[in-house]
Amino acid sequence: GTFLCSNTQKTEFSEKALKEKITSIDANQISFQEVLNQYKGKPIVMEVWASWCGDCVKAMPQMKELQAKNPDVTYLFLSLDKTVDKWKTGIEKYQIKGNHYLVNGGMRDSFGKALDLDWIPRYIVIDKNGKIVLYRAIETDFEKINTTLKSLN
């Protein structure tokens, strides 16, 4: 993907991103803003992934290691899967522990665009006050993600 230098470090999500509706595991449509509000008070690691994405699946063991090292962090998984069935099957199959949401549409749709999504897996780290501290990390950046989390304590 293209690397957009202007977007390498945003400290907050755009209005557009926050207004976007995503689907919760119990099939409710909820705005991204409401999702983030639910988890305020703790740092968040958010991963955009999909069950069809080979790199996402390959990175899952690293994600699990990150979770083991940082148990006090909230983990949000936003999937780009095409159907609810494929999404839920993927969560089961790869035993992904965390809070799960389904994005309506793909990488180039409005939510993907609002997050400057050019690659998945994509990781975003948010501090306990809701400020973005790492806007664009990918599967080769786990060390950076871990260091960022450690610096938040």
Would you name each region that the model predicts?
Residues 79-82, 101, 123:
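Nucleotide-sugar donor-binding/catalytic module of glycosyltransferases
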Residues 45-46, 75:
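Hydrophobic beta-strand anchors of alpha/beta hydrolase catalytic cores
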Residues 58, 96, 103-150:
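Thiol/disulfide oxidoreductase modules built on the thioredoxin-like
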Residues 40, 48-65:
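Conserved redox-active cysteine motifs that mediate thiol-disulfide chemistry
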Residues 42, 72, 97-98:
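A generic structural signal for alpha->beta connector loops
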Residues 58-94, 107-112:
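Structural microenvironment flanking redox-active thiols in thiol-disulfide oxidoreductases
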Residues 1-21:
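N-terminal targeting signals for export/organelle localization
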Residues 22-44, 61:
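A short beta-strand-turn-helix
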